[in-house]
Amino acid sequence: MRLGPRPAALGLLLPLLLYAAVAGASKAEELHYPQGEHRADYDREALLGVQEDVDEYVKLGHEEQQRRLQSIIKKIDSDSDGFLTENELSQWIQMSFKHYAMQEAKQQFVEYDKNSDGAVTWDEYNIQMYDRVIDFDENTALDDTEEGSFRQLHLKDKKRFEKANQDSGPGLSLEEFIAFEHPEEVDYMTEFVIQEALEEHDKNGDGFVSLEEFLGDYRRDPTANEDPEWILVEKDRFVNDYDKDNDGRLDPQELLSWVVPNNQGIAQEEALHLIDEMDLNSDKKLSEEEILENQDLFLTSEATDYGRQLHDDYFYHDEL
């Protein structure tokens, strides 16, 4: 197959999706909790939304679902006292997040490593992502605005690739590839993530991100009496979620909590939600009986990765 140039709009789409996976985490949360209300169907859609996964879920009989679920409950119960606390649920959900992120990265590594030599080169990454090797000259003027935006994102990817390549070899090892795909999971990538975010959002170069910079190019319509709902939501997030010291700007650490998905916070929120919904005797913890009584709810939550763990013996196997 001849690898020719791809349409600019399509070329832009892929890196934008990658960027949105990190910077747009708050949008997914809005879908999960519209107007602050939990959508149980979103839980199932999020990972069981693929029809093949739904089919596998349905194939399991009720007794087998229950057996595997009981095995998972025992593993979540780290102190073996017969109850699941908020902390135990939160720790389990965070472990689940990391497990699936690592599994996905390992699968991607095999796909990207075209010559199966145990390393992913920059050219191999480009071929897998864009069907062609892209080599932008940073200083060449481009007439096409979309192509210019794509070049900017592509060069960012290249910088992240080079940062992940700790040994400066010809390609990324599996561990380095994981650092490239999931920099939030690797300590040596933290500073790079912060600097990348500052370059993107810190327009005046003071080392902080103000509310105006946080909102990007938004300007209120002069004919409107108030900001649109999504702007009000983003302002609320800035003030209440990210600006911890209330100084009206985000320092590098506060910025990190914005641009990197906060798995700990998400996991804690889901743990509290489950206890609130399933704790029949109001003791702030869950017994096996309470969970089995609300089995459908538990299987549409992040505690079982929306039922996915029932099909992954890493979680329900006795030797985890």
UniProtKB/Swiss-Prot annotation:
Not known. Binds calcium. The modification Phosphothreonine is found at T140. It comes from Mus musculus (Mouse). It comes from the Eukaryota. The lineage of its organism: Eukaryota, Metazoa, Chordata, Craniata, Vertebrata. The keyword Thylakoid does not apply. PANTHER family: RETICULOCALBIN (PTHR10827), RETICULOCALBIN-2 (PTHR10827:SF78). Ca(2+) 4 binds at D202, N204, D206, E213. This is Reticulocalbin-2.
